[in-house]
């Protein structure tokens, strides 16, 4: 947990705002976990859980972090493993050697990109439905009949669990007439996606990827961020228009704020924005 910046960022953010909730999502897994699956599924599941538990334990020991959510599947999986999700829920519920109550950790699934297969499986499988608290979807502002049913009948939260951060540098795009903050992936376009994601998908959270970036000038995704920190050795950072756009939402809708469906609207169009 000390090899990358992520856990340190989380600790710094919690020091500023203790009410922040934390979600753990894996993009891969160590080779020793993958090798365990060559022995049997049981060996693989046990190895993967040991790795996750060791991470949770270390994050608490080193940084004092308590995680509220775990995304059960690997990022943007194309194959949902129901058996693993149920195994993870069972092990967390029966964990007796933990620095805090792991039974309270909620599961998010399944961080798919552009699809909602997990929702249909949850409708058909009551055990899976009971194990999962949040449906996480990537890069879509839309739900479907299954996500709507799970939200309305079963109280499952729907998250836009990975969405683009604004991708333009406002100082290079704004015009003399104060236009220019528009276009695909602009700050206004991302604001439009946040608005549309509730009206069209019942999504109550938008997670930026990335919120903080340290890409060098000219690198792929270089302008994609809320906060740019390409020179950490100097202490310099830049807040672009996306940061202030996000603040409009976070300051307007504090935790616990409720949506009034009749007062919400989004035209369902993505990759566009009001021009003035």
What are these regions (language model features)?
Residues 1-124:
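Substrate-binding cleft and catalytic face of glycoside hydrolase catalytic domains
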Residues 53, 57, 79-276:
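Substrate-binding and catalytic surfaces of secreted/luminal carbohydrate-active proteins
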């Amino acid at each position: 947990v000390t090899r990358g910046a992520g856990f340190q960022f989380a600790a710094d953010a919690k020091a500023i705002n203790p009410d922040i909730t934390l979600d753990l999502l894996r993009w891969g897994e160590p080779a020793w976990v993958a090798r365990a699956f060559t022995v049997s599924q049981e060996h693989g599941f046990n190895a993967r859980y040991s790795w996750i538990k060791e991470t949770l334990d270390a994050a608490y020991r080193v940084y004092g972090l308590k995680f509220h959510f775990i995304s059960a599947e690997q990022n943007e999986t194309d194959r949902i493993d129901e058996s693993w999700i149920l195994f993870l829920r069972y092990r967390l519920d029966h964990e007796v050697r933990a620095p805090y109550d792991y039974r309270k950790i909620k599961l998010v699934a399944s961080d798919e990109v552009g699809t909602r297969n997990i929702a249909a499986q949850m409708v058909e499988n009551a055990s899976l439905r009971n194990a999962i608290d949040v449906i996480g979807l990537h890069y879509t502002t839309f739900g479907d009949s299954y996500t709507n049913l799970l939200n309305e009948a079963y109280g499952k939260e729907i998250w836009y669990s990975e969405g683009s951060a604004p991708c333009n540098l406002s100082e290079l795009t704004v015009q003399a007439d104060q236009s220019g903050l528009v276009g695909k992936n602009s700050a206004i376009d991302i604001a439009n996606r946040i608005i549309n994601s509730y009206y069209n998908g019942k999504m109550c959270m938008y997670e930026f990827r990335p919120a903080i970036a340290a890409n060098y000038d000219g690198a792929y995704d270089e302008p994609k961020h809320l906060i740019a920190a390409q020179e950490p050795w100097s202490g310099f950072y830049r807040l672009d228009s996306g940061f202030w756009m996000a603040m409009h939402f976070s300051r307007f809708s504090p935790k616990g704020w409720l949506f009034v469906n009749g007062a919400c609207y989004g035209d369902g169009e993505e990759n566009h924005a009001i021009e003035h």
